Structures are given as C-alpha cells and as structure tokens.
C-alpha cells in the first residue's frame, strides 16, 4: 500500500493514478493525498505525483493534532530504533506532517528524540531541519530522500476520516530531470506555448490507461471503476489499445507501441513517449516546428539513451495540416496524444467580442482535426488532447463548444469531470479531454 502526494491540479493527478493503477485501487484520503493499492510504485513514470511513500502503519487520530503527533512520535522512535540500531550506515532522515495543526518545531522534536536514542546504539543520524511542518519537494529531492534505505523521509498524514498514516518515502518528483528535459533542450519556442514535460507524461498515461477511466464516477472521496486492475504497463496497454492493434507484434522483445502527435510543436509529447519506450510519429503545420522537434528528439536520444535504458524509435516527423492529412498506418496507432491549437495568448481577459472570435477559431480548427482523424483510427483508439479553456476575472470558464458534440464527431469522452491544467490568474488554460474513437475505419484510398 502506498500514498501519493497529489500535484497542484489534484483532479489531474487522481485521474493519472486511476489510469495507471486502476480506479478500484485509488482512494482519495485527504485534499492532498491518495492511497494506492499496489505492490510497486515508480514515481518517475508519473507526472502528477509529487511524493510517494509506502504505508508503514495507520491508526485512529487522537482528539487533538498534538496528541496524534505524540502517538506517531512514540511509534516512530520504537520502530526505527529497532530497525536502525547498530546500522553501519549513517542515516539521513526528514520528517513531514500533513493536515496536522502542529509547528515545524513540534515535528522536529520527533526526529531529535530518535536521533538521541540511536546515538546510544552507535548509529549516526543526520536530521533534515524543518522550517515548515512538511519538507518541500526541493528539500526532499536535493537530499535524495527515498532513494535508498539510508535516506528516508517519514510522512505523517491525517486523513479526512480522522486516521493517522505513517509512511516511508519511496521517491520524490525529480525536478532536476524535468528541468533538464525542458530548459536544456536545443530548441524552445515560448510563442507556440511550452507544454511542461510532466504534463506530457500525464497525458500519455491518461491515453494509454484510458480503458480504466471508463465508467469512472465520484464516490465520496474515492474513485471507482468497473474494469480490471491496471497495476502494470502491459495491463494498461491491453485495456487501452484499439481493436485493430496487435500487442503481440514485436520489435525484438518489446511490444510495438506507437504514439502520434499531430500538433508536435517542439516535440515535448514525443520526447516523453520516447523516454517511456514508445515509438513516435509527429506532424505539425509549421516546418519550423518540425525542424525543432527533429533536433530536440535527436538531442534526447543522444543524451538519455543508455545500454540499460533504451528509448523508443522516431518513425517519422514531417510537415502536415492536421485537419486534412492522411497518416500512414494510422489504424495501428496505440494512441493519439497532443496539445492542439490554443489560440492567441492573453495577459488579461479579452473583450467578449475578441473572446468569441478566438473561441470560434480554435473550435473550427480542433473540430476539423477530430473530424479528419476519426475515420483513420481503429475503433476504440484512445486520445488525450489538450484544448483551450478561457477564464475571466471572476474565475468563470468558457469551454470549446465542440465538447458538447463529441459523440456526433465520433468520440466518447472518458473523463467525467473536467481536467483543467492552469496556473493561478492564467487566462488561457489547458483542458484535457480523454477520448475513445467510435465508428468504423474508412480505408485509405
């Protein structure tokens, strides 16, 4: 059993966990956390999880948060005194408390008590200082907490049903790696938008685990589904892949999984797909973007390929209009993942007339794309596409009209709740649509 610290957009983080592990195995336990029933949890494959930790114990919370912390402190001291006594390794320890009204000093006391106790048995412990009750992502990452049995972060979480969970970190979001894959690429273009690599990673997981989102509904703080468990990648692929796709087709010993991005821009979706081991096809209306993508993917392959970690293959990158193009072998695509045309950027809410113009333009282009590609896809091909949504000063959103007509366009929408990726005060947000193609494939002439 694991717990996951959700990202800034918790609904998106939850949807990703549901797609990867299966909704029956994901339960929201607080505003910030979900519990995940699984034996394995690799945080590097998830863009929406900030920290993950293995549950060590849980018990009813006390009447006050300070009493709960005291009970947790007793357990931690007893459990880890026995575990680490006479350890030949120096222990690095961090402590984080969530949803407990306690001070950083109160949390630190638990570590100091354990440090003193271990010193008597000859074990050296370095305690990471707290300036807040919970350690930041950067602090946990920079101290490599969760990366080895000797570098540990203990998470104390009070749940909404008043239980106290003590969990041992198994990793934190690698902010250094994301920065390298984003800002260190040879080609970037702020004008066309810069899709964060972790959002691209989320979108790939949503698409390839799309089958697990079917029938998703809210049930208190939990997320439920009727499909089978998707706790490993092969099961995710078997649930999500289109009818015409043959998972047994192999390249060496690796299943052939091909991702298409018809709006590839600078190649962020494709690079994350390559790192996950998938083959990629990319197109863009702009030859400049095609050139940028090709250079970025070449950099990625030369930078990140190692003997123990091969990346996927670049099958084709070329210039094409997504509203009219015919993609070769499109019935064999595993998924379509893309950030579509987001329209004009705004630093302040536009006038109603300007907004109507931009909405109409984006709606026309994206409708044209969905109409064009649908008959080229095998039935049940999953898509995860980012489309624009516009927010006014009061926080009210304007959505694309096409969202209400997806079935007429030949798609089922699998996410039942809106998945909005947006910074505070951002005018143009990204709305994620998780879709499945319906209808028959039209043979190419």
Language-model features, listed with the residues they occupy:
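Class I S-adenosyl-L-methionine-dependent methyltransferase catalytic core
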Residues: 1-55, 63-71, 99-113, 137-153, ...
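Short, charged beta->alpha transition segments
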Residues: 66-86
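Extended, charged/glycine-rich binding lobes that contact polyanionic ligands
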Residues: 110-131
């Amino acid at each position: 059993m694991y717990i996951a610290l959700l990202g800034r957009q918790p609904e998106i983080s939850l949807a990703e966990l549901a797609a990867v592990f299966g909704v029956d195995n994901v339960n929201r336990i607080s505003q910030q956390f979900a519990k995940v029933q699984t034996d394995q949890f690799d945080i590097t494959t998830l863009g929406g999880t900030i920290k993950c930790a293995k549950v060590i114990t849980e018990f009813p919370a006390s009447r006050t948060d300070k009493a709960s912390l005291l009970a947790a402190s007793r357990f931690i001291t007893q459990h880890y005194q026995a575990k680490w006594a006479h350890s030949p390794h120096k222990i690095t320890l961090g402590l984080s408390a969530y949803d407990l009204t306690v001070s950083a000093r109160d949390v630190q006391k638990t570590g100091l008590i354990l440090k003193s106790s271990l010193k008597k048995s000859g074990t050296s412990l370095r305690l990471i200082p707290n300036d807040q009750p919970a350690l930041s992502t950067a602090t946990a990452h920079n101290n490599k907490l969760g990366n080895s049995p000797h570098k540990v972060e203990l998470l104390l979480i009070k749940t909404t049903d008043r239980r106290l969970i003590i969990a041992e970190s198994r990793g934190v979001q690698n902010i250094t790696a994301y920065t390298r894959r984003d800002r260190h690429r040879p080609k970037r273009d702020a004008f066309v938008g810069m899709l964060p690599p972790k959002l691209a990673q989320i979108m790939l997981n949503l698409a390839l685990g799309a089958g697990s989102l079917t029938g998703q509904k809210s049930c208190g703080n939990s997320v439920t589904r009727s499909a089978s468990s998707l706790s490993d990648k092969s099961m995710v692929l078997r649930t999500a892949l289109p009818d015409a796709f043959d998972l047994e087709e192999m390249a060496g010993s690796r299943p052939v999984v091909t991702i298409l991005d018809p709006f590839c821009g600078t190649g962020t979706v494709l690079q994350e797909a390559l790192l996950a081991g998938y083959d990629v096809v990319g197109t863009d209306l702009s030859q400049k973007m095609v050139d940028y993508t090709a250079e970025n993917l070449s950099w990625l392959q030369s930078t990140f390929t190692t003997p123990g970690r091969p990346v996927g293959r670049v099958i084709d990158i070329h210039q094409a209009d997504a509203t009219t193009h015919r993609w070769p072998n499109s019935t064999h695509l595993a998924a379509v993942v893309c950030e579509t045309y987001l329209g004009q950027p705004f630093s302040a809410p536009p006038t109603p007339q300007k907004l109507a113009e931009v909405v109409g333009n984006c709606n026309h282009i994206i409708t044209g794309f969905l109409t064009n590609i649908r008959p080229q896809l095998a039935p049940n091909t999953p898509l995860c596409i980012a489309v624009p949504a516009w927010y006014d000063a009061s926080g009210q959103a304007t959505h694309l009209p096409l969202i209400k007509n997806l079935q007429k366009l030949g798609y089922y929408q699998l996410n039942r709740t809106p998945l909005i990726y947006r910074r505070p005060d951002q005018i143009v947000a990204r709305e994620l649509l998780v879709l499945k193609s319906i209808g028959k494939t039209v043979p190419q002439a």
